[in-house]
Design a protein with these regions (language model features):
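Catalytic machinery of carbohydrate-active enzymes
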Residues: 1-354
């Protein structure tokens, strides 16, 4: 059986979709799985034991430069392969067009009422019907379940997929060694994920500082690194992950450096971030891909939501918690209610995990 997965972007969506694909090797041991992805996000799927062939496309780059001929040539080279199933897990017109160009026995995706872009739904031979507003976990599981000859009921498949999700994400020993050199000896590492695609999805520097103080038991700041008067832990170290907002990272570092071990991480590619996440005892951040990666790699996490609805985006796991600052979130880019989540509430959850 030859299966092609089309999920081109974005990072968080790829991570969640990939988590549900991991179980397919268990269900279909002889299956070959190819994955079509934009080059910007290919690193998150590299070194996977589940993916047989990673088909990397310069989609964004070619579209930005209007190099449509180059893009078509790039896609057509994959037509030498014939797949049993091509599954578009994205539901956009661009992903549906790509899937349509591939040779397959069955081309599957979301129907026109369920796809993010309804026109995409008309291109599939089989379309899964599930409300776009439904849980992203259920949507990803359902489109795979409906497309493939799975010999078990949906609930069993769903939980099989959730249990197997960590098998998808791999990295090299070189990546692991690079990460190990950044860690503190004898500490439990808490990763603060400082950025997201939108400012409204990021927890503020002020709140991260208060959270660090709460974890150290130094809510008022007068107890120093050894303070434990408010339930702090001396075995905790904080790592700060940022990509562009170095000023935010430096502000948090300066406020926490006298209270507990803290370090600003160097810029990392996606392979290094996978190796980093594998060593984290807890990851805390907004509704963004790296926070989702903690769930996907079965690492403890606390995901913070504000302008996106918790019921739709929450990723559930044994040690994966979610908190929301707005029970009526409606995707408003000016909604910064993520910062209504009290740092002490997050710290309380963190203590339960650690």
């Amino acid at each position: 059986m030859k299966i092609a997965i089309v999920r081109l972007s974005a990072l968080g969506d790829i991570i969640v979709s990939a988590s549900f694909v991991a179980c397919l090797k268990e269900l279909f041991p002889q299956a070959r799985i190819d994955w079509f992805v934009d080059e910007r996000f290919a690193g998150i799927l590299e070194h996977s034991s589940v993916i047989d062939n990673l088909c990397v496309l310069p989609l964004k780059r070619y579209l930005k430069s209007w190099n449509l001929i180059g893009l078509v040539r790039c896609v057509l080279k994959f037509r030498a392969e014939t797949y049993d199933y091509v599954i578009d897990m994205q539901g956009l017109l661009k992903s549906a067009l790509l899937g349509k160009l591939l040779k397959s026995r069955y081309f599957c995706g979301f129907d026109n009422d369920s796809a993010r872009e309804c026109l995409a739904g008309y291109l599939y031979e089989h379309g899964t019907k599930i409300a776009y507003e439904d849980s992203i976990m259920e949507r990803n599981a359902r489109v795979l379940f409906d497309a493939l000859p799975v010999d078990e009921n949906f609930q069993k498949f769903f939980w099989r997929a959730v249990s197997a999700r960590g098998e998808m994400f791999g990295y090299t020993q070189e990546h692991a060694n690079s990460v190990n050199a950044l860690l503190f000896d004898g500490k439990k590492h808490v990763l603060f994920i400082l950025e997201a695609s939108l400012a409204s999805k990021t927890y503020s520097a002020e709140n991260f500082i208060a959270l660090g103080r709460a974890l150290a038991g130094d809510g008022a700041g007068e107890h120093g690194a050894q303070g434990t008067k408010r339930g702090g832990r001396e075995d905790i170290a904080v790592l700060l992950l940022c990509y562009q907002d170095t000023q935010k990272a430096e502000e948090i570092y300066e406020e926490l450096k006298g209270i507990l071990p803290v370090k600003i991480l160097p810029k990392m590619d996606l392979n290094l971030i996978k190796a980093l996440m594998a060593r984290m005892d807890l990851a805390i951040g907004g509704d963004t891909g790296i926070t989702h990666l903690a769930w996907a790699m079965q690492r403890p996490s606390i995901a913070l939501y504000g302008n996106t609805p918790l019921a739709r985006f929450q990723l559930k796991g044994a040690k994966n918690f979610a908190l929301s600052g707005n029970p009526n979130a409606s995707y408003d880019k000016n909604d910064h209610s993520i910062n209504a989540i009290a740092p002490e509430e997050i710290a309380k959850r963190a203590r339960e995990i650690l």
